[in-house]
Amino acid sequence: FQKMVYTTYINILWKRGINMRDKDCIFCKIAAGEIPSATLYEDDDFRVILDLGPASKGHALILPKEHFRNLYDIDDELAAKAMVLAKKMVKKLTDVLGCDGYNIVQNNEECAGQTVFHFHMHLIPRYKGDQVGLEWKVGELTDEVRDEILEKMK
């Protein structure tokens, strides 16, 4: 019952635009230093750690210390800081690892592959010939679909 009340309270705060740490969120605990991690970088807003289930050597995660469910919830200033931090980390990791490229991945909601509901960014080093699969079938943008989307976006 207490967990249900706490979760309801957090949801009400989120709807009001007030974010706070979720006591049951594994990434909140890691970001706060309550759970040990291989920390590559830390500041007042973020912790960057090595992923325990890496897609490739050097796969890292950027975790904000404040709890946001996903990109829809994070405030603009912190989202911008996350991207600047991603750039900084990718440059440093490329120098250290000698990788050939990078994927920066950020999933939102279960259907898009989000498994931990705390905003985070994956920094995935890529190496020539690696078997990391981040591809999708290329479709075709028809005139009808293009026009429909453009109209709805006005």
Model regions: which residues?
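Charged/polar low-complexity intrinsically disordered segments
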Residues: 2-3
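HIT superfamily nucleotide-processing domains
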Residues: 6-154
